[in-house]
Amino acid sequence: MSPCPPQQSRNRVTQLPIPEPGEMELTWQEIMSITELQGLNAPSEPSFEPPAPVPYPGPPPPPSYCPCSIHSEPGFPLPAPPYELPAPTSHVPDPPYSYGSNMTVPVSKPLTLSGLLSDPLPDPLALLDIGLSAGPSKPQEDPESDSGLSLNYSDAESLELEGTEAGRRRSEYVEMYPVEYPYSLMPNSLTHPNYALPPAETPLALEPSSGPVRAKPTARGEAGSRDERRALAMKIPFPTDKIVNLPVDDFNELLARYPLTESQLALVRDIRRRGKNKVAAQNCRKRKLETIVQLERELERLGSERERLLRARGEADRTLEVMRQQLTDLYRDIFQHLRDEAGNSYSPEDYALHQAADGAIFLVPRGTKMEATD
């Protein structure tokens, strides 16, 4: 019997196992159905030379091919140019009958089981030959590669689609990729803090109730209540406020008015001693605060006084400088008006002016005994 169409690769025909004479017809039908499904991979040899796409008006006529044309469907698409063919086969080592779920319909169930056992050897060789010219089809591989990455982000989807067909799995991943990939982890990340908030808030709400700041007033209240409880237990006939706040004479009269045992007297004196110590400590703190306030006021007063004195000193310095300048001008003016017998003016470097006790002014040469004496 003559081989199938010339478009079928020789390696696939030569490497098929030789069937028995009784199963020859079924084997040929199986091969023809596989070649129909491999319409995209059939023209592997013309991919090495620049192809010229020829438009096909319709399916090829029946007499041009052998029994392969009998099983061809009228709506089956024609082979595309070589640069678009290896898109699904460059990185996916699946058999050619798993390219799409719609292409597996013509294969009968008993024939596909035998085809799966007989075709794994020629598929890697054909894929290797076609993968050499799979350069221009890389943009079509992005959806499949990304769909493979999506398995790492959604484990539930991978478990649900594990038993389905390869073509259906690939198409579902492409459809689900833009929706599931960006939002697969966001709901989980938002829900976990919601479950963690209630246990985190409970210790925070309990911390302020047992804080160290509130322990001091409670301790004082406990001390007062403790003295009262001890006084009630010892049956003291007067309240603890009188024990602490009464003066010495009134306190002694109060003790003399009631007959008390030694233990009661010891308790009363202990309560008074601790109460007086507490009052004394409060008064001491009050006096310290008052002293600090007085010192701060005194410092403010001294600071303002210092600023006032500095301003007065500056004004005195300016006034003194003005007086010195005026005295110098007067001294120069006097020497300009003084003349000797010859009518010559006196030089300030050689003569000086001295004032006597009665207010008289004398012109004295510099360096004389009178100047030194004066």
From Swiss-Prot:
GO cellular component: cytoplasm; nucleus
Post-translational modification: Phosphorylated on serine residues. In undifferentiated erythrocytes, phosphorylated by MAPK8 which then leads to ubiquitination and protein degradation. Sumoylated. Sumoylation is required for translocation to nuclear bodies PODs, anchoring to the gene loci, and transactivation of the beta-globin gene.
Domain bZIP per the UniProt entry, residue ranges: 267-330
Subunit architecture: Homodimer; can bind DNA as a homodimer. Erythroid transcription activator nuclear factor erythroid-derived 2 (NF-E2), composed of a heterodimer of NFE2 and MAFK, possesses transactivation activity on beta-globin. Also forms high affinity heterodimer with MAFG; the interaction promotes erythropoiesis. Interacts (via the PXY motif 1) with ITCH (via the WW 1 domain); the interaction promotes 'Lys63'-linked ubiquitination of NFE2, translocates it to the cytoplasm and inhibits its transactivation activity.
GO terms assigned for molecular function: DNA-binding transcription factor activity, RNA polymerase II-specific; RNA polymerase II cis-regulatory region sequence-specific DNA binding
Disordered, as annotated region: 1-21, 40-61, 132-165, 207-227
Residue(s) carrying Phosphoserine: S158, S171
Region (Leucine-zipper) location: 292-299
Name recorded for this polypeptide: Transcription factor NF-E2 45 kDa subunit
Bias type Pro residues, positions: 48-61
SMART domains from the UniProt entry: BRLZ (SM00338)
Family: Belongs to the bZIP family. CNC subfamily.
Subcellular location: Nucleus; Cytoplasm
UniProt keyword list: Activator, Cytoplasm, DNA-binding, Isopeptide bond, Nucleus, Phosphoprotein, Transcription, Transcription regulation, Ubl conjugation
Region (Required for interaction with MAPK8): 1-83
CDD domains in the record: bZIP_NFE2-like (cd14720)
Role this protein plays: Component of the NF-E2 complex essential for regulating erythroid and megakaryocytic maturation and differentiation. Binds to the hypersensitive site 2 (HS2) of the beta-globin control region (LCR). This subunit (NFE2) recognizes the TCAT/C sequence of the AP-1-like core palindrome present in a number of erythroid and megakaryocytic gene promoters. Requires MAFK or other small MAF proteins for binding to the NF-E2 motif. May play a role in all aspects of hemoglobin production from globin and heme synthesis to procurement of iron.
Residues joined by cross-link Glycyl lysine isopeptide (Lys-Gly) (interchain with G-Cter in SUMO1): K369
